[in-house]
């Protein structure tokens, strides 16, 4: 039976992939509240930049794996790469539970980066494979909603478990269960290779040079040669640079101002919860109003939210700031990936997505590195304030350089 393209036509597969990414995100959520505090309290790391080294290792490993994941998936199939990612993920909670030194935590986060780079990349690409062109924003939005719902749920749960028991090992027992479920779901889901072939056939043009590009050509196009792809990549990097800072510094900032671990965990959870929730609507909205407006105003909303968090001084307003930060991130996250799908040919779309995700997730590492250095020199507040400048500038850059990539709106 021939395959058909469309979310409705592949609803069972689509739902399976959404649920799978819920568990992918949960792997990161376990760490968001616990690890920054673990570095200070159990391993006695006095330097902020040293304490954030686990994010740097995670960011760079995920970024590098993202780059190669697209190419590997184009050659060997999405499902195999998805399964490989989950197998690698099994070692993350085990190493964290038994770690006797901080370098073991850092190494575990290298493996977490590999896990996330392989699994999350594949759930995105597989959804785009089975979706129509005018459903890409919806597909990516639902994917990211599920993933960041997992992040939020586990950030809150791990914070609760850590405050009720201890920072280790109890929160990481959850991670072992998550990996087992992820492997089972990945065995059930079907590969989307046949759907991809249909898209390549339907997209075939006389200009073969556009459709068939080398890895180097795709990297150059996505990084700097194509003004749309490069603008998208810069906005992605700025978004996750801010997130790398938030991941590392928010727990330290909020506990410093007097909040409990449980309260801090709530704020740390609300941000990705809002991020995930609003993507239910922003992905669909980008399919209707276009990509450029959401990207530009989303970057500015992120910058404003960070400055707002520093300006206010109450738990309820910090919650509001976290919601605004999640909203701004949700405006750009599915939209940027949908825009890649608009511009790139199906033949090299996964590779281009890999390059974009390479630069985007390098932001985790750069954000933690820059924020850690500034925090050590000037303090945590200054680090948050300065990092907020980058998403603001990325919004200006998108406003000036990015075309509308959704063809129905661009016309």
Which role fits each region the language model picked out?
Residues 1-11, 194-232:
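Juxtamembrane intracellular "pre-TM" segments in multi-pass secondary transporters
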Residues 9-59, 228-231, 235, 239-257:
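Helix-loop boundary and gating motifs at the non-cytosolic
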Residues 58-67, 151-152, 272-280, 364-365:
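Residue-level signature of mid-helix packing/kink "hotspots" within the transmembrane helices
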Residues 65-77, 162, 279-290, 375-376:
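Helix-to-loop junctions at the C-terminal end of transmembrane segments
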Residues 77, 98-103, 290, 311-313:
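Helix-breaking motifs and short loop linkers at transmembrane-helix boundaries and internal kinks
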Residues 80-94, 293-308:
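Structural signature of the two symmetry-related core transmembrane helices
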Residues 110-149, 338-339:
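Cytoplasmic helix-loop-helix junction between adjacent transmembrane helices
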Residues 170-187, 384-399:
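Symmetry-related core transmembrane helices of the 12-TM Major Facilitator Superfamily/SLC fold
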